[in-house]
Amino acid sequence: DGKDTIPSQINDTDNDGLWDELFFVANFKPKESKNVQLIWVDKAPVYVSRTSARFGKRSSADTPVKPATKEIMLANELPKSIGYQQYQTDGPSWENDKIGFRHYLDGRNAKDLFGKKTSKMSPENVGVNAKGEVEDNYHVMHDWGRDILAVGNSVGLGGYALITNTELMRLGVTVDDSINNVEKTTFQIIQEGPVKSELEFTYENWKPNGRTYSVKEITTIVPGKYGYKNTVEFNGLKGDENLAVGLVNINNNLPIQIIDQNDKFIILLTHDKQTYTKEWWLGMALLVPKNKYLGYTEAPETGKLSHTYLAKLKLQNREPIVYYAVAGWELSDVKFSDPEYFKN
């Protein structure tokens, strides 16, 4: 009857074709314990979807978008070089019952933000018109919400770069470029279910300024949270690089806040009318590991990577770094117009 059943899903985390994780979400008070009983059933229950991952692609300018779960993009397959945008919403999107995001797979590798006004999942045709063509139809208000964030040449909310004492290296390129600095970009939806959706990105032979790196990224979203978890891992580091995680500041008038939350996290937070045309209140934050945090810097106002705060984190080869990106929009919850409410 659903009253005593915790929504769950089984996941294949090592991609061997067999499930190895039973995943569910539960609320706990501090030091609270709960008894959960595992019962095998013949038929898997169908639960309300509280997370989703979506990706669509058209194979030519004249063919309709079709759903897909994976993609390989080569350096010469940017919109500027092939003459059209091949990806629905410029790349994959993921959401939960609170908020949504999208990743610009088209070489830019920035993270954009969908504000949501409903707990239901957004329609499958977001970013596609009636003819099946890629179309920017999400910068206007719908019943479910809309794209609310101006990204420009930043990396959006939770995108990242590498930084040294002398240079800032963007993973990928801008909308004006026709050749990527990443030789091969691979993407796949690892899992999509009612309580967890996960995406994987790999970047092979990223070559900024005479260097060569490979990068692996896992993006995870679960219900009930106004954000997502990101795990990134680098190979090819020379030793002078730090990770730089972005918090876009194109429409900011109010200063960034740095909160020393506890022994695990540092929070970089902004709260402002920082949506498109500065129409609504929006709080955004990065939660980064305290033992890796090296302070923050601000990107230039022009160039390949601009208009963003950057949290600097210590890096080592093949060591995963985990951080969280969070946002609260006043039309999702009117209380997000209050900076103290968002902060707390």
Q: Whereabouts are the PLM-identified features?
A:
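Solvent-exposed beta-strand/loop surfaces of large extracellular or lumenal domains
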Residues: 1-21, 207, 251-267, 290-302
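Alpha-mannosidase-like glycoside hydrolase catalytic domains involved in N-glycan trimming
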Residues: 1-67, 71-73, 77, 82, ...
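Primarily extracytoplasmic ectodomains and periplasmic/lumenal surface modules that are beta-strand-rich
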Residues: 3, 43-45, 94-95, 99-103, ...
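Beta-strand-rich recognition/accessory modules
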Residues: 11-29, 285-344
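Short, hydrophobic/aromatic-enriched beta-strand segments in well-ordered soluble domains
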Residues: 34-44, 199-203, 319-331
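Extended polysaccharide-engagement surfaces of secreted carbohydrate-active enzymes
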Residues: 84, 90-178, 227
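Extended, loop-rich substrate-binding clefts of extracytoplasmic carbohydrate-active enzymes
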Residues: 142-222
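Acidic (Asp/Glu-rich), glycine- and aromatic
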Residues: 215, 221, 226-260
